[in-house]
């Protein structure tokens, strides 16, 4: 970890994918006037937390304990200390909003890693996560 105090927008990989799929559907039906524009599919503002808090959540939901290793050396990389994205346009234009809160996001990610580490069946695990996500089958 370069800087555990930096704040980032954490999201489940299927969240933006669902946004892009909805956008493609709207474009195919000519419901978007100008398709040459940029789109953000961002998590909820509550999902923007410091890296250290994310590590704490991973430790909460992961059966394996995560060891936090901080890189104390000065990085030459310029890095934003507070990274936040806005998906207001997606919300307003195509009625897309993220579904998962941060706890559920981290739990789903930890579940995926735990299952794939045990079964080594990445395809089946990923397919099940996709089905659950689009059927709105969540439990915390």
Name every feature range the model reports, one short phrase each.
Residues 14, 25, 45, 105-107, ...:
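Catalytic cores of nucleotide-enabled group-transfer and carboxylate-activating enzymes in metabolic
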Residues 11-39, 60:
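Alpha-helical substrate-binding/gating segment
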Residues 102-140:
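Amphipathic terminal alpha-helices
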Residues 3-15, 43-47:
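Glycine-rich "substrate-gating" loop/helix at the edge of Rossmann-like oxidoreductase active sites
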Residues 16, 20, 41, 51-54, ...:
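Non-catalytic, hydrophobic alpha-helical segments
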